[in-house]
């Protein structure tokens, strides 16, 4: 575990816009480069939602936040295993308000336990149809 990353994460406030440098998992063959091809550097930028996970802690970054009329969000997120983190850079503290950050966290924690109204299911069908056109 990178103790510097843990220290950086513990000082973050939910709602801050951050960049996380990390190394992704990789697949390869021993004849295709061996040890030099193992590290896959990645950086992700998003709104810090929290450090979550039952077994292993993950840095949760929200990228796209779809707000519905009832104040619940559907969130596109990246979950980066804490142990894969290399560096964290704060771009802007409290990029969104504390209240909105709390709404994002609450929506994230609701997960699949919430059913969306039929009108949103229709919207989802339209979005899926659009994806097939690409």
Question: Which functions belong to the PLM regions below?
Answer:
Residues 2-134:
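Conserved RNA-binding domains used in RNP assembly and mRNA/RNA metabolism
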């Amino acid at each position: 575990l990178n103790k510097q990353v843990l220290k950086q994460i513990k000082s973050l406030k939910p709602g801050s816009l951050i960049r996380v440098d990390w190394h992704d998992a990789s697949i390869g063959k021993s004849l295709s480069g061996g040890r030099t091809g193992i590290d896959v550097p990645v950086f992700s930028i998003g709104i810090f939602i929290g450090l979550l996970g039952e077994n292993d802690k993950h840095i949760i970054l929200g990228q796209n936040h779809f707000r519905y009329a009832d104040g619940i969000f559907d969130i596109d997120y990246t979950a980066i295993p804490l142990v894969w983190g290399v560096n964290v850079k704060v771009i802007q503290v409290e990029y969104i308000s504390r209240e909105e950050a709390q709404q994002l966290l609450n929506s994230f924690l609701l997960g699949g336990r919430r059913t969306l109204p039929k009108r949103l299911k229709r919207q989802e069908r339209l979005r899926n149809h659009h994806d097939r056109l690409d």
